[in-house]
């Protein structure tokens, strides 16, 4: 992953790098790989995430429709 440093502005380049890494899910991946996760724990986590996403989508849909 590359970020251009313009006018020796390292702070701005770091900010851009962090934004790119966040968008691509690098931080999330690092957090998940920090410790070994058993396959059964992984399935349970993914199922819980899917349920959370479905609830969020339903909430947004109801909010748009005005219920």
Curated annotation (Swiss-Prot):
Record's keyword terms, sorted: Ribonucleoprotein, Ribosomal protein
Annotated Gene Ontology cellular component terms: ribonucleoprotein complex; ribosome
Gene Ontology molecular-function annotations: structural constituent of ribosome
Pfam families (alphabetical): Ribosomal_S21
Origin: domain of life: Bacteria
Example of a GO biological process term: translation
Keyword Ribonucleoprotein: yes
UniProt xrefs under PANTHER family: MITOCHONDRIAL 28S RIBOSOMAL PROTEIN S21, SMALL RIBOSOMAL SUBUNIT PROTEIN BS21M
Family statement: Belongs to the bacterial ribosomal protein bS21 family.
Descriptive protein name: Small ribosomal subunit protein bS21
């Amino acid at each position: 992953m590359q970020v251009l440093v313009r006018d020796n502005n390292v702070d701005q380049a770091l900010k851009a790098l962090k934004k790119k890494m966040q968008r691509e899910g690098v931080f999330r991946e690092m957090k998940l790989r920090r410790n070994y996760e058993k396959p059964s724990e992984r399935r349970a986590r993914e199922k819980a995430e899917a349920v959370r996403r479905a609830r969020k989508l339903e909430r947004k849909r109801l909010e748009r429709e005005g219920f």
